[in-house]
Amino acid sequence: MNIQISIHSAKHSNNLSEQVRRISNSHDGIILMAPTLESEDYEKVSRKLKRYPLVSIAPVDGNILPTITFDSYEGGRLAGESLIKSGFKKFGIIAGPIVKWEANLRKNGFNDVLKKNGFQIDWNYQGDYSFLSGKAALKGLQESKFNNMGIFSSNDQMALGFLHAALENNMRIPGDFGIVGYDNM
């Protein structure tokens, strides 16, 4: 059996359709990793590639195409467990986009383990999975006057933005805050 694997990058959904068309002419199947795409984008790609095997390794709402992904609920639950075991009594979340299925699962897992242990989400920032929204989250947290809080970030980009902003503000992590990201970046 002769298998070749190629990796292609499409930065924006507006050039994804063209790239998919080119790839489909020279490949036997596609494994798609595009966590920032919306359902409509997945539908377009799926329609263009009807006769090619196509699997997504990023969560996709609905039954648009076969998906192999992580257990986002369990990831959120484990993040909460880790912060509880670290001794935090106040908790916050830098949540992913509400339109993203996996972001909601991560938040639900985090919230459920907190409730099970007698805690709650005390601070919530709605992010967009970007580094800049992580930086903005720190500003929002500073305005809320919370400190010594365990924070779960729904992805590592936002966690890195939060950490970067914290260092710019001479904060200590751990110390002033603890943070757990998601994605294993």
Task: Please place each PLM-identified region on the residue numbering.
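A short, well-structured beta->alpha microelement
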Residues: 8-18
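A glycine-rich helix N-cap at a beta->alpha junction
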Residues: 32-33
